[in-house]
């Protein structure tokens, strides 16, 4: 998988996560599916099927890989997501949109069927969409080949109930073409209506609805062909359901679907044949049906009469049926078969559905998953109907395999398995997961008896045994053992409920996850021997019947059992058969309670003590263990039976198998005793040897504890040690009392030896590690002993190489060592050994990126502990380019435990920074005084680090992370950085590199608006002045640019984004702008690009917001510099140049004489032409405003302008421009604008709403120019009469606004004034008579205008036009 870059998670399953990935050095994207290795068989099955498929509507499979903890599938990446998400967003789709989906689905299904593959899991979440909206079928984990179905039709009863066909709930029902087509009908129905056709929150109600209720009609105006298609797909009888030939030729399809050759379905044909035989037997209490039914009878209300716990195709039609008036035959008045099936009614053939049995099987399989983590842990809602399954969502998948008892190795015992349970919560059908798969791969089960030699694989079989051959249609006994709610055990340090609303305060608040205390049965499951039951000489009720019998009813049976067990007349064979029968009873919780708390258990204890036959003692010990395992309550009376002594003696037996099963049974009993939690407020005894008396009848001596612990000594049988390890693991999960009793030096040494032993199976080593974790958790001083026996380097090495479960154990041990570091005499000696494990960092990064939620969270905590204990680790993690992006992506995860770990991690790392900055500051001060030199020791060196300045880049990297930035930047940190900016003004070894990093850090901070606004006072008073000092005399261009950019970013945010600036901050801002920035401006403007552009923009902003006065600017002789850009290449000009010149030209403090001396009017006109030619819209208004400012200055002194000038045109009035003009204040080269009057008129003609402001300024410039340079302006104006016509004509085209009218009035005034000047100065110009006539016509119309003032001006202009020579 190191060929791929792994990005964010795009989908989640129960034991899988799908990531977006990219192949390295390419732009090819893939979906990389990571599956827990415990699902290896299922993954390989999916790979085999995907490898054989190649179709545009089937998800492409590229490769698969196996890593130490996961299986990886590299699949096609579909950007459109899945259909389920689409329906959640849009609720439902129109028929025309469904058509394309349906067409692709039919093509894809037909392709699969042509390859002999039944999909078995068609539902919206398995239908992906590509960028073009075409569908892709995915997830073939449940798919089956026709050949496999023919060989074993009864297996594979798994699926999503909402989309399963009715026949799949029936005895003998199998997957087929027909069941896939039913699912297709459900999907299309859901696309149109927004919900599946049959909906219920409880499994039993859902199955009844699917099997009995007619298909709900489609709402709205669905086409007849679409309605017919849905009805044909949702016919309940698979034999009558639409088939491929009819489906391909259906009227719904606009383009033809070609029918391909399909393989035969022998198993399906057999199922149909069986269901149509003339006589069937019904298994409902083993009562035969004499006649084959055709239809179900309706009662008087029209409802069908049926057993609550089973649904049948019909009742016998030749036998009078209860509830039928007069007992008449049922079929006479019923509708025809075709009529019912047309409406998706009931199946015609005789089929039986035992709903309660199916529900109980599904519930049992769900509980088995739960028990892997929650054995003997009370579960919520325990008083609800134990056979009912709540269906949380339409995508929930259930397992209906009754033989799923020992479906594979225990999650801790498989040589290749890893604990899928570690990434799950307490079986609450986690709604954050898209898939809720509760199935796992099956392995063949073999019957075994206790006197056969068990293999280590048998010891792994620790799931609940639910294979009893009972009729589940009877009243429901407990489907699997569930404890009564015991008094809550000690929960010190247990993070069970990860409430994301409560923020963690420290790492220890989120240290533990519920999976850290997962417990499992010690006793392996035993397969019931059905033959043994039949060979007994007395009646043997089924477990469900046994549990219903009263005490008096059971007494004769108990006496017979006791007689056989204790009587000398009974042969060994009969006793062994009886034991096998009792094993069958033990799998029922109610029956196990009766046997455990009754006389039979007392006899079993006695027989175990007295029997001399090893094989029989093995069976007795096994039976005792099974009874205790499955019992939910054990009375204290059993404590007086000597059961502990008997099992203890068995543990001392010389026969290996007796010791094995005695240990397993003793382990179950000790664990039960530990759950009675009477040591809630336990405090360790003064002496470890001091006995602690229990309030209950159970007394567990220290000698017994020592005996169990001694089993782990070197040389003992591996299986016996497995049972002892499970015992210790389970008991130590119950709190400090029990953990302290087991915390002996010898036990810890033995556990460490087993954990390190290379010859032991991985699962055994993991259990030993789990025991060490629990001992150290509830008895913290133990961790020091563990680390002395098991070095941190060895634990880290196991973490690198181990499976997911071992990695969780290693992380817990490492984290506890970090927490207890203060108890070690020299923890640094231990910690430095971790640096020798070169693969530690890559493994941690891989876990944080791709591991389960629990492992990710714990890995983050470990990184935090490492960095907290030694700052050397900071650079390893946070200066790595991959680490922080991975951490940032975790913020998108929904898992509450992971989010709390992430928050605690961020808080801890952020809390390290202030102390680190203080240390760096002290080191630099010592470097400056010569008391310390700069070289840095490497990470793996044992020598003390000479300086910490090399850690400073960590701050920069953290600021680039969205997770850390806001947590890190506090007033304290900012003041520390401000202090460092003062220090770097002086010289010291390594200063230049450190200074650039410091400036980059400040740049990151000042680029964030909230941080700047919250800390404006510190930035303005303490940081910005120091930056001005750093700029001065700095030879590094990058450093100089960063200084200015920090100024620019900070002030831009403060000036533009702060609604109100405090008065004191405003005064400070004004002060530093004039005292620090303005003196630098001449140097800034001469610096290398892009520094001048930033400096100009900042200066303009400060001038506009009145923080810098023009008078202050003038003192620094910067005027000529500001206008220099006009003399150079105009293409290099920026808008801030123009704005700055505009500010200067508009300021009253500016002397016109200075502007006149610059002689830049012609260059300003050239700039206007350049702006127009290049269509530079952002330059247009400032450039025109600059022209206007120069024109205004040319007309008189500054005071006169402000008091007498008005925007209303007065050129034709008697009193126009009556104020005095000071020749010294005029712009001498103002007449150069005369060549630009055509441009002014062009811009004045822009009359759309977005350009009216430009037209306003341009028309004003024309008015001012005619007065300032009358002759030149008149010449330009009259030679551009064609440009005047459209301006005046706009009066006709649009409704005039106030500003538009002002522009028209100005142009009319200019026209009249120019005519006057032409005549008065006897100018010789060639004027087009045609243009004059057109203008005259428009002006004549304006004389009749009702717009205010326009008609009077038009009259005056008309008179002047008449005077022009023709």
Swiss-Prot record:
It catalyses: L-seryl-[protein] + ATP = O-phospho-L-seryl-[protein] + ADP + H(+); L-threonyl-[protein] + ATP = O-phospho-L-threonyl-[protein] + ADP + H(+). Belongs to the protein kinase superfamily. Ser/Thr protein kinase family. Disruption phenotype: Seedling lethal. Abnormal cell division with defective cytokinesis due to abnormal phragmoplast organization and arrested cell plate expansion, leading to enlarged cells and nuclei as well as incomplete cell walls. In metaphase and anaphase, enlarged cells with several mitotic spindles or a single greatly enlarged spindle. Impaired endosperm development with altered cellularisation. Cellularization defects caused by disorganized radial microtubules (MT) arrays in seedlings and adult tissues, as well as during male meiocyte development. Induction: Cell-cycle-regulated. Residues 283-302, 367-376, 422-433 have a biased composition (Basic and acidic residues). This is Serine/threonine-protein kinase RUNKEL. Essential protein that regulates phragmoplast microtubule organization during cell plate expansion in cytokinesis during cell division, both somatic and syncytial. Required for endosperm cellularisation. In pollen development, involved in cellularisation during microsporogenesis by regulating radial microtubules (MT) organization in microspore mother cells. Seems to not have kinase activity. One of its GO terms (cellular component) is spindle. Gene3D superfamilies: Leucine-rich Repeat Variant, Transferase(Phosphotransferase) domain 1.
């Amino acid at each position: 998988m190191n060929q791929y870059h792994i990005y964010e998670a795009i989908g989640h399953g129960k034991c899988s996560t799908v990531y977006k990935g990219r192949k390295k050095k390419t732009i090819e994207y893939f979906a990389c599916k990571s599956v827990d290795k415990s699902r290896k068989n299922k993954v390989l099955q999916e790979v085999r099927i995907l490898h054989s498929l190649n179709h545009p509507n089937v998800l492409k499979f590229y490769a698969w890989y196996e890593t130490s903890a996961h299986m990886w599938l590299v699949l096609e990446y579909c950007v459109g997501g899945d259909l389920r998400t689409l329906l959640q967003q849009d609720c439902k789709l129109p028929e025309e949109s469904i058509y394309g989906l349906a067409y692709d689905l039919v093509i894809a299904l037909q392709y699969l069927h042509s390859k002999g593959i039944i999909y078995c899991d068609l539902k919206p979440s398995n239908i992906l969409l590509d960028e073009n909206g075409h569908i892709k079928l995915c997830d073939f984990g449940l798919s089956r080949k026709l050949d496999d179905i023919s060989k074993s039709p009864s297996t594979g009863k798994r699926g999503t109930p909402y989309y399963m066909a009715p026949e799949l709930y029936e005895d003998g029902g199998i997957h087929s073409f027909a069941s896939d087509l039913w699912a297709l009908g459900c999907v299309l129905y859901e696309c149109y209506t927004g919900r599946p056709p049959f909906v219920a929150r409880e499994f039993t109600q859902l199955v009844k609805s699917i099997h009995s209720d007619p298909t709900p009609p489609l709402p709205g105006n669905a086409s007849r062909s679409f309605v017919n298609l849905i009805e044909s797909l949702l016919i309940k009888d698979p034999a009558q359901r639409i088939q491929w030939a009819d489906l391909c030729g259906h009227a719904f399809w606009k383009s033809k679907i070609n029918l391909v050759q399909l393989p035969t379905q022998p198993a399906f044909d057999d199922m149909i044949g069986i269901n149509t035989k003339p006589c069937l037997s019904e298994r409902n209490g083993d009562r035969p049906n004499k006649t084959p039914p055709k239809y179900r009878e309706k009662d008087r209300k029209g409802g069908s009469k049926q057993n609550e716990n089973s649904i049948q195709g019909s009742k016998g039609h030749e036998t009078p049926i209860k509830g039928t008036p007069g007992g008449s035959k049922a079929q006479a008045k019923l509708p025809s078969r075709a009529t019912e099936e047309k409406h998706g009614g009931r199946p015609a053939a005789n089929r039986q559905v035992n709903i309660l049995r199916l529900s109980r099987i599904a519930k049992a399989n769900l509980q088995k998953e739960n028990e892997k983590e929650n054995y003997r842990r009370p579960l919520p809602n325990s008083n609800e109907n134990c056979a009912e399954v709540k269906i949380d969502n339409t995508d929930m998948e259930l397992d209906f395999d009754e033989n799923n008892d020992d479906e594979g190795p225990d999650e801790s015992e498989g040589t290749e398995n890893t604990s899928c349970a570690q990434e799950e919560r307490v079986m609450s059908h986690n709604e954050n997961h898209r898939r809720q798969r509760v199935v796992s791969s099956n392995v063949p089960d073999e019957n075994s008896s206790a006197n056969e030699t068990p293999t280590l694989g048998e010891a792994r079989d620790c799931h609940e045994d639910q294979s009893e051959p009972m009729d589940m249609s009877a009243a429901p006994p407990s489907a699997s053992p569930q404890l009564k709610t015991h008094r809550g055990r000690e929960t010190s340090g247990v993070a069970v409920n990860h409430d994301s609303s409560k923020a963690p305060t420290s790492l220890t608040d989120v240290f533990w996850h519920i999976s850290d205390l997962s417990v499992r049965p010690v006793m392996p499951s035993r397969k019931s021997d059905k033959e043994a039951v039949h060979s007994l000489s007395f009646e043997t009720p089924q477990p469900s019947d046994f549990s219903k019998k009263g005490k008096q009813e059971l007494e004769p049976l108990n006496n017979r059992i006791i007689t056989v067990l204790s009587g000398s007349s009974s042969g060994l064979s009969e006793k062994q058969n009886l034991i096998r029968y009792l094993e069958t009873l033990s799998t029922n919780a109610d029956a196990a309670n009766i046997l455990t708390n009754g006389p039979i258990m007392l006899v079993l204890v006695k027989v175990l003590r007295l029997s001399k036959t090893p094989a029989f003692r093995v069976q007795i010990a096994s039976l005792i263990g099974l009874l205790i395992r499955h019992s939910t309550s054990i009375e204290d009376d059993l404590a007086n039976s000597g059961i502990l002594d008997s099992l203890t003696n068995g543990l001392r037996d010389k026969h290996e198998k007796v010791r094995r099963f005695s240990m397993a049974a003793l382990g179950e009993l000790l664990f039960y005793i530990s759950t009675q939690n009477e040591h809630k407020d336990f405090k360790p005894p003064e002496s470890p040897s001091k006995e602690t008396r229990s309030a209950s009848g159970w007394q567990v001596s220290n000698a017994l504890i020592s005996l169990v612990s001694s089993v782990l000594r070197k040389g003992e049988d591996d299986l016996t040690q497995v049972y002892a390890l499970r015992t210790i693991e389970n008991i130590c999960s119950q709190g400090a009392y029990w953990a302290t009793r087991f915390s002996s030096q010898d036990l810890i040494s033995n556990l460490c030896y087993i954990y390190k032993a290379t010859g032991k199976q991985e699962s055994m080593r993991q259990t030993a590690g789990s025991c060490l974790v629990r001992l150290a958790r509830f008895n913290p001083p133990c961790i020091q002993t563990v680390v002395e026996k098991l070095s941190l380097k060895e634990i880290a090495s196991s973490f690198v190489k181990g499976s997911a479960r071992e990695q969780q154990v290693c992380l817990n041990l490492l984290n506890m060592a970090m927490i207890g570091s203060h108890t070690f005499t020299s923890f640094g000696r231990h910690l430095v050994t971790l640096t020798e494990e070169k693969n530690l960092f890559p493994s941690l990064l891989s876990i944080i990126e791709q591991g389960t939620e629990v492992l990710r969270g714990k890995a983050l905590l470990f990184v935090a502990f490492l960095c907290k204990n030694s700052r050397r680790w900071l650079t390893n993690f946070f200066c790595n380019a991959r680490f922080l992006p991975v951490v940032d992506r975790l913020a998108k995860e929904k898992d509450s435990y992971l989010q709390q770990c992430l928050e605690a991690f961020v808080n801890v790392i952020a809390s390290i920074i202030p102390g680190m900055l203080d240390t760096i500051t002290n080191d630099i001060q010592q470097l400056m005084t010569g008391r310390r030199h700069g070289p840095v020791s490497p990470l793996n060196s044992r020598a003390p680090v000479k300086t910490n300045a090399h850690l400073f880049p960590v701050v920069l990297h953290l600021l680039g992370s969205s997770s850390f930035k806001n947590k890190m930047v506090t007033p304290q940190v900012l003041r520390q950085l401000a202090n460092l900016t003062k220090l770097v003004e002086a010289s010291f070894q390594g200063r230049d590199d450190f200074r650039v990093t410091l400036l980059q850090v400040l740049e990151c901070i000042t680029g964030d608006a909230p941080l700047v606004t919250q800390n404006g006072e510190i930035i303005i008073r303490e940081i910005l002045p120091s930056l001005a000092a750093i700029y001065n005399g700095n030879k590094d261009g990058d450093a100089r640019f960063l200084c200015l950019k920090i100024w620019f970013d900070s002030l831009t945010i403060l000036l533009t984004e702060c609604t109100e600036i405090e008065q004191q901050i405003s005064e400070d801002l004004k002060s530093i702008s004039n005292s620090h920035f303005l003196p630098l401006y001449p140097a800034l403007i001469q610096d290398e690009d892009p520094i001048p552009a930033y400096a100009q923009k900042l200066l303009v902003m400060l001038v506009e917001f009145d923080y810098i006065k023009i008078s202050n600017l003038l003192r620094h002789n910067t005027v000529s510099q500001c206008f220099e850009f006009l003399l150079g290449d105009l293409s290099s000009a920026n808008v801030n140049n123009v704005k700055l010149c505009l500010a200067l030209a508009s300021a009253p403090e500016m002397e016109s004489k200075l502007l006149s001396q610059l002689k830049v009017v012609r260059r300003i006109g050239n700039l206007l032409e350049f702006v127009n030619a290049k269509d530079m819209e952002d330059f247009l208004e400032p450039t025109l405003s600059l022209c206007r400012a120069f024109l205004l200055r040319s007309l008189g002194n500054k005071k006169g302008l402000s008091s007498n000038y008005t925007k209303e045109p007065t050129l034709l009035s008697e009193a126009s421009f009556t104020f005095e003009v000071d020749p010294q204040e005029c712009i001498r080269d103002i007449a150069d604008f005369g060549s630009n009057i055509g441009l002014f008129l062009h811009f004045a003609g822009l009359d759309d709403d977005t350009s009216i402001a430009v037209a306003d300024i341009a028309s004003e410039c024309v008015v001012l120019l005619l007065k300032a340079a009358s002759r030149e302006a008149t010449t330009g104006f009259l030679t551009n009469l064609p440009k005047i016509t459209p301006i005046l004509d706009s009066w006709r085209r649009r409704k005039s606004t106030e500003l538009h009218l002002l522009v028209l009035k100005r142009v009319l005034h200019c026209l009249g004034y120019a005519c006057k000047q032409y005549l008065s100065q006897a100018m010789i110009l060639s004027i087009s008579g045609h243009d004059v006539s057109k203008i005259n016509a428009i002006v004549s119309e304006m004389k009749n205008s009702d717009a205010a003032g326009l008609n009077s001006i038009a009259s005056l202009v008309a008179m002047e036009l008449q005077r022009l020579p023709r």
